[in-house]
Amino acid sequence: LGDVYKRQNPQRNEVGMAEEKTFLIKIITPERVFYEGTAIMAEFNTSEGEIGVYAGHIPLTVILKPGVLTLTEESGKKKAALHTGFAEILPDQISILAEAAEWPGEIDIKRAEAAQKRAEERLQAHSSDTDMARAETALLRAVARIEALR
């Protein structure tokens, strides 16, 4: 029975645990392939909250919210600002289609802080012509950029 299970589930052992500790991850934005490589774990924000993904994760499709992406590779951790989009999670890979993604070296801290201040002012003003959802998203993006630098 164990041999049958292994043939049907080559990525898992007899007790259903993932044997492979890394998985493929590809992050694509309209401008470029932002990242393509292997990771031990990926953490990012979804519309349902923060998620941490390891190899062998159940298949899942999620909507991304702006936040910090943390990739744990065998050589260490990498952080980036990840904006809205979608992620398809499979047991051996993650595919992320994002509106934008930025490494810390690509982020202008002064610009991000100014964007955060503007978004907070728009949200506090409660003006009838303010698109609240758009202002909230702008605030989340600015905070993600700042957090990715920490």
Segments and roles (model prediction):
Residues 1-5:
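Short, small-residue-biased leader/transition segments that mark boundaries at the very start
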Residues 7, 12-31:
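Extreme N-terminal tail/first-helix region
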Residues 8-11, 93, 116, 124:
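Residue-identity detector for glutamine
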Residues 15-18, 94, 137:
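A ubiquitous, low-specificity "background" feature that marks scattered single residues
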Residues 16-17, 62, 70, 127, ...:
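Intrinsically disordered, low-complexity segments enriched in polar/charged small residues
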Residues 24-118:
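Compact, glycine-rich, soluble single-domain proteins
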Residues 101-150:
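Acidic/glycine-rich phosphate/pyrophosphate-binding loops and surrounding catalytic core
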